[in-house]
């Protein structure tokens, strides 16, 4: 089953913002300027996320997030995530939307990245994406993200250098690049997620000490 088979494809053709910032933390890796660098950034970001998850204890994985109560600490995009499963399925759903975005371009009817019902209310959109997976297990969430991550890597690799890095090459990307869209649903949020999980670890350890 393709990822696009399980997601509503209704879109609205108006200018939208990218889901996440696209600038990579320069202390971690440089912003990609070639296709190979983009693919490396996507792969490395995913590897770092999995490395961070592997470092977490069972107690830390089971503990609910506390940092999401303060948007200044986690950013509005992560406010509705209450646990690791939420974070992973959130990433997965953003990548599903990206696959739909690319498929629409290739099928000759390009549309904007976000569906109509999501574009006008990001917070409600993120809440809906999290609620959609209330019955998804953590292991299922990991598998879903593994599949969508591979899809993102393969799709990014299928574009030419010109298609990826020319601003406005596709009208539906407006004044930005296709590479920026791929970064905004892969490497950038992967690295943001790593930072959030490290914060969660510290918070959990502090709570344990207080107990």
Predicted regions and their residues:
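N-terminal amphipathic/hydrophobic targeting modules at extreme N-termini
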Residues: 3-8, 13
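Short, Lys/Arg-enriched N-terminal segments with co-localized hydrophobic residues
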Residues: 11-28
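A short small-residue
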Residues: 27-30, 72-74, 125-133
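Extreme N-terminal tail/first-helix region
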Residues: 27-54
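A non-catalytic, amphipathic alpha-helix used as a structural packing/dimerization or gating element
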Residues: 40-48, 143-151, 188
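Short secondary-structure junction/hinge motifs that connect adjacent elements
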Residues: 55-74
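Short, contiguous alpha-helical
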Residues: 68-124, 153, 163-211
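Acidic/histidine-rich alpha-helical segments that form the ligand environment
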Residues: 120-165
């Amino acid at each position: 089953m393709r990822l696009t088979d399980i997601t509503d494809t209704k879109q609205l053709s108006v200018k939208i913002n990218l889901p996440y910032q696209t600038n990579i933390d320069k202390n971690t890796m440089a912003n990609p300027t070639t296709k190979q660098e983009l693919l490396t950034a996507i792969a490395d970001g995913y590897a770092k996320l999995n490395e961070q998850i592997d470092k977490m204890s069972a107690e830390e994985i089971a503990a609910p997030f506390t940092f999401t109560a303060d948007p200044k600490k986690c950013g509005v995009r992560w406010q509705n995530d209450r646990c690791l499963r939420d974070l992973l399925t959130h990433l997965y759903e953003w990548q599903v939307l990206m696959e739909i975005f690319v498929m629409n371009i290739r099928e000759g009817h390009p549309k904007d990245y976000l569906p109509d019902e999501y574009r006008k209310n990001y917070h409600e959109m993120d809440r809906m994406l999290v609620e959609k997976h209330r019955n998804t297990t953590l292991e299922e969430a990991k598998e879903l993200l593994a599949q969508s991550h591979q899809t993102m890597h393969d799709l990014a690799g299928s574009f030419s250098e010109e298609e990826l890095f020319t601003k406005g090459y596709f009208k539906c990307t407006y004044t930005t690049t296709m590479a920026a869209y791929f970064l905004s649903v892969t490497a950038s949020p992967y690295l943001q997620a790593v930072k959030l999980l490290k914060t969660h670890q510290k918070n959990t350890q502090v709570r344990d000490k207080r107990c």
